[in-house]
Structure formats: structure tokens, C-alpha cells
Amino acid sequence: MDNFHLIKIIGEGTFGKVYLAKDKSESSHCVIKEISLTKEKEASKNEVILLARMEHPNIVTFFSSFQENGRLFIVMEYCDGGDLMQRIQRQRGVMFSEDQILCWFVQISLGLKHIHDRKILHRDIKSQNIFLSKNGMVAKLGDFGTARTLNDSMELAQTCAGTPYYLSPEICQNRPYNNKTDIWSLGCVLYELCTLKHPFESNNFHHLVLKICQGRVAPISPHFSRDLQSLIPQLFRVSPQDRPSVTSLLKRPFLETLIARSLYPEVCSRRIQSHAHMENMAIGPTACWRVSPWSAAYLQRKFEAQQYKLKVERQLGLRPSSVEPHPNEGEKLQSHWEETKFQELQYRKNKMKDQEYWKQLEEIRQQYHNDMKEIKKKMGRELKRVVKFEISLDKCISEEDTVQENEAVDKLNATLSFEDGTKFQEHRCKEEHEDYTDRAFEELCGPEAEGFFQDVIAAENRRQWDAGAPHTLLRIMAMADVTSTCPTMPDDGQVIVMEGSVENGKQWWLDVPGTPCALAAECACSGSLSASKGETVMIKPQLPKEDQEKVEIATGIMVDDEQLEPGSDEDDIKFEESEDELRSEIIESLEKLAASTEEAEQAPSSSKNAEEPGEKEKTNLPVKKLQ
């Protein structure tokens, strides 16, 4: 580690940490992967061996490895574009173009083909293990920590390895698998590029396994081509034998045209040269990917030398135009070469412009996100409020209360059953009814309802009818200043002659027992009143004409104690009459009674007039005959 300068930690993998470092001797950036030998000794050695064997433009380049303090450090190529998962997350819902998706897919497939040709299973192909370099234009496959080498192309592996979202059905079902499990994972990566989400998602691992075993995914957007839409279902076939291999994928017409653009120019020239000498030379599997840096320049110099030789021979006359089978062939070749060179220059210029454009677009997008974060932070500071809590240290909270509170919280976190849901609905309906009642009460409590409440309070404070016998009339008669005289015509027809003048007549006693109230109390509301002295005489009250007939029918009925009991609600009439009205009616009846007595004293014949209907009322009063 002394030869490297560690800059920062850029990630943590399955078996250790990953550092961004700088080589002190070459001053170039690199990635150092730290692996603990005590935990994953075999896996770390396997990764070093496999990376040392991999030499491909679409596989992360291996530089060196060393051990230090019981740890293994692997020095690899640094990809400045990050991994593919980070690139997908930066899209924020904006879909990739189909050309970009297919370009990355072809490059990943080429790297995977290079692995499968060497009988190696990656077993952990995912977007986090695919790295981007050269401004995101080149995709490279990395992280061979879970890779395994097979002894035969027909051999099957049985170890469960990989990331749950990218597991194949045969691994989930604990069945043997081969290189077709990497094809399933490759389909998951392609689906993420098309939809920006996982093909199989679930919060539960058991449900996720069930979805993977079914192999059903939602179709991608119809804006993509039919070739791409039909390719994804083929990669997600449940049976491994039905899935295509990497070689058959790259032979598809719409993918084969992109291979030339995905490879470097020197790789293309090397492939052309290798095909030309395929019949005479036995080229190893790795030779086609080893490219000499001077091959393209050599071909160009050879072509220029041939053209210069033909030109000199023509000028010297050593090679006339008639000798040539095609006189204009040299000119055609020269024009063709110039045209291809011009096209190549234009392609490079356009590529540089595209790279600058994407770089500027990425800077603008990053600046926009930074500005939005600052605005949200400012808004959060403005909306932030302080909440103060006051805790009394004198009062001790019992443990039972805390246990009860925790139980209440647990009940809220628990799932509601059917009975709990029914009770919750009933309680909710009751609360809504109470809310409506409270709203109605608030409306009544408004300024318009103040008079209504005053009337209700006044009605509650009014005197009500008692359950006993009424004494209102008797009390008024007891308080009134009344004088009584004897009638001149008794029932037996004899005339009572009073001694002396009217002023010397017998007066009512002022004692309380002689009053009608006391007599009524002593007689318990009987039909007749007895005076303390003298004989008892029934005096009929004077009634109006319209009630005379009713009184004549009811005169022969004696009043019993049962009739004085309070009647039912149907017998009560006019409860709204006030005491003032009753008092005024009683006073009027008493005045009429007094006037009738005065007329009886002045005219002896007034007894006849009293018998006429509707003039006077007869009242039973106690009288005493004069001797």
C-alpha cells in the first residue's frame, strides 16, 4: 500500500471495501479492492486468478494483486462513470433511448461471451457490477467474487449464489444450473434499462421467489421496437433450455449491426486480419482479442505505398494504362480511401460533439439538482418550529403506566382483525353522530338562539302543577276582606227577620279556623262546609249561562277524595294560564257575589231574580238563623 495514495472509499462489496487510489509512480487513478483472507480466502484467490485471465475491452482490467496484514488487495482499472445502477437512478424517471440501451446491452453481452467461452459462470450479473467508463459510452463487467469455473461445458453447478432480485428459477428451486442462469440475470439488467425498475419486486423473499418461478413480467413500453419487445420474454423463459445463448443473441440482425460500433477501431481491424489468416493459422481463443497498436497504421502505410508505386510507374512509362485490367482502379481506390478517411473524421467529430453535449447536459442537470436541494433546505429552515416539552422530575411515573402505554402502542401497530374492523366502524359512526350533535348545539348557541334558550330557562323556572289538591282559590278567599249576610229566604220558606239595622248584623269571625281554607282542610275537601256555629246550608254558585246546564247535571254529585287526586295528562287543560289571570277571575266572581248580596238586602224580591238562568251564581256558605 506504500506505492498508492488512498483518496476515498467508493463502495463496499460482498467480501470487502473498495478504495479509489492513485499510483505514486504513474500518477494515474486505480481501484483497490480489499478482501479479508480470514473470511473469504478461496473466493478471493479465485477472483484474482479469473481476473488475471480476462483480457477484454468490456471486462474491468486487472493490474496486480498483493497481500498485507492478512488481507488481499486487488488493483484494477478505475471506471469514472460509476456503475449502471447509479446511472439508472440519475435518470429520475426519464427513459433511455433505444440506441443507448442496445449499445450497453451488446457490450455487456460481448463481455459475457468472453467469459462463457472460457467455461466460467459469473453468477452475479447485475447493474451494480456493470461499470461505465469514457463518459458512460463503454460498459464493462466486473466483480468476479462469486464466479466459478466449470470443467466441462455440460457441467452443472449447484451452489446458491447471487443477488435475490437477479436469481434464476433453477437457483430458487435448488436445481443444477449452467451458463443459462447468467442469461436470466442479463435479461433482468435489460429490463431495468427499459423500465428503470426491477422486473420482480416484493417486500417478502418468499413472494419474490414465487414471482421468479412463474417468470411473468409486465411488458415494456410500446415505443420500443418489436425486436426489443420480443427479446425480453425469451430471456425470461422458466426452462433454461428455452433461453437463447449469448452467441445466438449476438447473431440477431438488429444486434449484429451494433457490434462494430461497440468495439474499438483496432479491435475491428484485428478481427478482419484474423479472419483473413484463419485458414493458414491456428489462432487461440485469446488471440483474436489481443490487438497490436501498429496494425491500423501498418495497413494505411501499405496502401499508400502501393498507390505511390502505381503513380511512379505511370509517370515513367513502365506501366502503361493498357496493361492494367482496370485502368481507373487506382483512382477509385484512392477516392474510396479519401472518402472513408473523411467519414471517419466526421464520425470522430460528431462523437466528440455528442460527448461534449452529454457532459454539458449532465452538468446542467447536476446544477439543477443542487439548486433544488438548497431551496428545499431553505424552505425546511423556514418551516421548522421548536417544540418544548416540560417534564416534572418530582412526579414519578410508575412502570405499570409505561407498560400500559407500550401495550396501547403495540395494539396500534398490530394488524386489525375482522371483529376489530367492525368495532372500529361502529365507533366511527358514533363519533360522526356526536360531531353532528355538537355542530347543531353550536348553531343553537349562536346569537340567534339566545332568545330560545332564555325561553327554555324561563319555562323551567315557572311554577308547575302540583300533584295534590289545588289550594289557590281557597288561599285567595282566605286573604280577601269578605263580609257575609244571611239570606232572607231560607230553604223552608220562612222569612228570617234580622234585628236592628244591617250594620248590626252578624259578621264573619277573624279567626283562621272559621275561614273556608281552614274548613276545607278540616273536612279534607268534602262536598259541604260546616261553620263553627249555626247550621250548614248549601249555597249554589252563580255560573254563566253557557255552563248552567252542566252545573245543574253535576249538582247532585258529591265530591269524593278520589276526585281530588291529580288526573291524567289528557284531563289537564290550559296549563299555560298564569296566576294573574286566575286571580282576576276570582276577584270578579267575588265582586259579583258581593253585589248580589247587596241587592238581596235592598229588594226582598231579589230571590226570584236569582233563580233566573245566567244572572247569579249560588254559593254554599254557612249561615245562622236569627231567633
From Swiss-Prot:
GO BP: any one term: positive regulation of striated muscle cell differentiation
InterPro entries for the chain: Kinase-like_dom_sf, NEK_Ser/Thr_kinase_NIMA, Prot_kinase_dom, Protein_kinase_ATP_BS, Ser/Thr_kinase_AS
UniProt entry keywords in alphabetical sequence: ATP-binding, Cell projection, Cilium, Flagellum, Kinase, Magnesium, Metal-binding, Nucleotide-binding, Serine/threonine-protein kinase, Transferase
Subcellular location: Cell projection, Cilium; Cell projection, Cilium, Flagellum
Residue numbers annotated as active site: D124
Any one GO MF annotation of this record: protein kinase activity
Residue stretches of biased makeup (Acidic residues): 563-580
Basic and acidic residues compositional bias, start-end: 609-619
GO annotation, cellular component aspect: cilium; sperm flagellum
Cofactor(s) of this protein: Mg(2+)
Pfam families in the record: Pkinase (PF00069)
Region (Disordered) location: 563-582, 591-627
EC number from the UniProt entry: 2.7.11.1
Annotated ranges, domain Protein kinase: 4-255
UniProt-annotated binding residues for ATP: I10, G11, E12, G13, T14, F15, G16, K17, V18, K33
Domain of life according to the entry: Eukaryota
Record SUPFAM superfamilies: Protein kinase-like (PK-like)
Reaction(s) catalysed by this chain's protein: L-seryl-[protein] + ATP = O-phospho-L-seryl-[protein] + ADP + H(+); L-threonyl-[protein] + ATP = O-phospho-L-threonyl-[protein] + ADP + H(+)
Family that this chain belongs to: Belongs to the protein kinase superfamily. NEK Ser/Thr protein kinase family. NIMA subfamily.
Entries under PANTHER family matching the protein: CAMK FAMILY PROTEIN KINASE (PTHR44899), SERINE_THREONINE-PROTEIN KINASE NEK5 (PTHR44899:SF1)
The protein's name: Serine/threonine-protein kinase Nek5
Species for this entry: Mus musculus
